[in-house]
């Protein structure tokens, strides 16, 4: 309703203009005054401005009164809907009265002739159960359809029965699932029109594959494959061909040359030694030494000692404890860690702040923070 009211406001000016254009009476030339009217409605978020034309004051007032009387009589024949009645009442409360009734914009319902009754014949089947229940439900609410719905349901075509399938020796019987399905349908009175066996093609008679060629390079199946074939044979499954033909023989590659040993070659680390020993216990011997893959450590020159000066401060307590912990485990750093800690800059002390009347004291949290720092020997020279 709100959308209808909001959309009607822009059309009020056009409706008033249409009243002027469609008027049938004639008047002498008169002066027309336009009065701007402000419209504000609780159904519209903002006010709208329209221009309303004042009524004509013509000498021939009989024609104008006759036109208004005929319009009032035509409005008696058709009652406006509830929404439009409320809209006219709402506009009348704001001093807006339309020049003619809005009922003339609602065309009357056309008087179409009733459709002819459908032709009933023997092929017309009755309505299904859902349609019967729907018509009964509508009849309970006083709704009666103008025509029968059975005419919209075309009759079932009289198609000829399909020809029976040709039975031959290759046709195999239905499987167990299909047999049970047909038996279940027969218990409910459903009989298929044709046999389902014709849709199952017979198994093709393919020739047996040729046996594989055995040669000296063919190695026996591994233990996993032997156990798999034995497990399948226990369940009555015999493969048509041997699986050994799918396993290519191992290539006879030449042994790699031994690596060149030099003075820079260091022995294998402890993890690699234990790995090689673990593989040797299981009969696995690597073809080459793994030491050749570990490059020797480069002989880099020792770094220059850092320049110590007066600004160099000693290591912090954490760094000193770290170096002591590493020294207990036999780890000595190659260079001093103090060179990575830049000295503290010698900045000038800041100027004291200017005290004035607007300077307010520190809040309670800042006072407690400064007191806590003073207890630990930290003195702040500048007020926060």
Curated annotation (Swiss-Prot):
Question: Which segments carry the region annotation Disordered?
Answer: 247-266
- sequence repeats at which positions? 96-142, 143-189, 190-236, 237-283, 284-330, 331-377
Which InterPro entries does this entry report, sorted A to Z?
A: T3SS_EspF (IPR006891), TccP2/EspF(U)-like_sf (IPR044889)
Consequences of knocking out this gene: Mutants show dramatic reduction in the efficiency of pedestal formation and in the intensity of the residual pedestals that are formed.
Q: According to its UniProt record, where is this protein located? A: Secreted; Host cytoplasm
Q: Which GO terms describe its cellular component?
A: extracellular region; host cell cytoplasm
Major site of localization recorded for this protein: secreted
Q: Where is this region: 6 X 48 AA approximate tandem repeats?
A: 96-377
Q: Cite the record's Pro residues compositional bias ranges.
A: 248-260
What keywords sit in the KW lines? Answer: Host cytoplasm, Repeat, Secreted, Virulence
Q: Which domain of life is it from?
A: Bacteria
Q: What does this protein do?
A: Required for efficient pedestal formation in host epithelial cells during infection. Acts as an intermediate between Tir (via host BAIAP2) and host WASL/N-WASP. Directly binds and activates WASL/N-WASP, which stimulates actin polymerization and leads to the formation of actin pedestals at the sites of bacterial adhesion.
Its subunit composition reads: Interacts with host BAIAP2 and host WASL/N-WASP. Can also interact with host proteins BAIAP2L1 and WAS/WASP.
Domain comment in the entry: The N-terminal 21 amino acids are necessary and sufficient for translocation into the host cell. The C-terminal region, composed of several highly conserved proline-rich repeats, interacts with the SH3 domain of BAIAP2 and BAIAP2L1, and the GTPase binding domain (GBD) of WASL/N-WASP and WAS/WASP. The N-terminal translocation signal and two proline-rich repeats are sufficient for triggering actin polymerization, but each additional repeat gives higher activity.
- Family per UniProt? Belongs to the EspF(U)/TccP family.
Q: What is this protein called?
A: Secreted effector protein EspF(U)
Query: Which gene is annotated as encoding this protein in its UniProt record?
Result: espF(U)
